Amino acid sequence: MGQYVIIENGGRYCYNLCASNGHVLVNSIVFPSRDECLKSIDEMRDTASTAGIEDSTEDAFDRIPSPKYRIYETMDGKYFFRFITSMAGDVARSHEYPKKESLLRRIERMRSECDSSLARQD
């Protein structure tokens, strides 16, 4: 199992979902409070394992309801996704990958590790 790691900076909070192998699966947006950050983690735990995939790199792609993984392509041909929830919208972003297949494997990894626990903080 992976871990959610909360980071605090100046009274604002974000989190990383780290896979069991230590790789960061996604980085969250910045939240104004720890409670909102924790709510986002709870929603991700509840929905990320069954969320659909919307591939905006395809011509005339079909829009699907949230929660979902929306795939994007950068100007230099790399791929990343954003995780979009039905309650809070766009809450997390993946790293960029040179191949879409690598990105799809990362989505599957996130689906299997989204119910991870919160890292212990001292």
Model-identified regions with their sequence ranges:
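Short amphipathic alpha-helical linker/capping segments at the junctions of internal repeats
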Residues: P32-L38, S56-A60, K99-L104
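Short, surface-exposed linear patches
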Residues: L38-K39, T47-E54, A92, L103-R106, ...
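A structural feature that tracks compact, well-ordered secondary-structure segments
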Residues: Q3-I7, C14-F31, S40-E43, K68-Y72, ...
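Intrinsic disorder/low-complexity detector
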Residues: M1-G10, G22-H23, R45-G77, S117-D122
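Long terminal segments
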Residues: D76, K99-L104, R111-D122
